Amino acid sequence: MKFFIFTCLLAVALAKHKMEHVSSSEEPINISQEIYKQEKNMAIHPRKEKLCTTSCEEVVRNADEEEYSIRSSSEESAEVAPEEVKITVDDKHYQKALNEINQFYQKFPQYLQYLYQGPIVLNPWDQVKRNAGPFTPTVNREQLSTSEENSKKTIDMESTEVFTKKTKLTEEEKNRLNFLKKISQYYQKFAWPQYLKTVDQHQKAMKPWTQPKTNAIPYVRYL
């Protein structure tokens, strides 16, 4: 009985020893296999690790540059902001003056138009009215009367001289007397009152302020 128990214990001990030896031998095999796989992966894909490292470095660099640019821009904006505030406060009056000047120059053509229209409304006689009738020259009555008197005086003086000096007339003087007679006949035929009336009517038509109301009286010709 004792021998049987001893053999069982011995068998169990041997079995444990074998199991430990197998497990211990399997562990280095597994470790060696893992190391081999890692070395194999490193040998097959060396570029991937390089790419990963370079891309990571670039990402880090870009992030650093962005942070630096953001900091610099924030610092510059902080420096520029008070200067801009000072400029706007100092130039308010200048900008107002410029705006007023621009508005004045924009409205300047309208002012010129109003100034041009004002005198025309106040002085309607400056606007010349064109009549459809024939134009008659404006002659003053005094000038006509003086010219008529002078012509009559000259004719009378020459006629008296002709009667007193009938014996001393020459051909040139005779021709002159004939010319003067023709002139006197022309002046006698010319209707002076009719001409003066036409001149007066034309002057009234050109100056409406002297006669605001026009009378529709028919024209009667003087004979």
UniProtKB/Swiss-Prot annotation:
Signal peptide: 1-15
MF-aspect GO terms: protein homodimerization activity; zymogen binding
Record flagged with keyword Repeat: yes
InterPro entries noted in UniProt: Alpha-s2_casein, Casein, Casein_CS
Residues recorded as bearing Phosphoserine in the entry: S23, S24, S25, S72, S73, S74, S77, S145, S147, S151, S159
Keyword ATP-binding: no
Function: Important role in the capacity of milk to transport calcium phosphate.
Protein name listed in UniProt: Alpha-S2-casein
Gene source species: Ovis aries
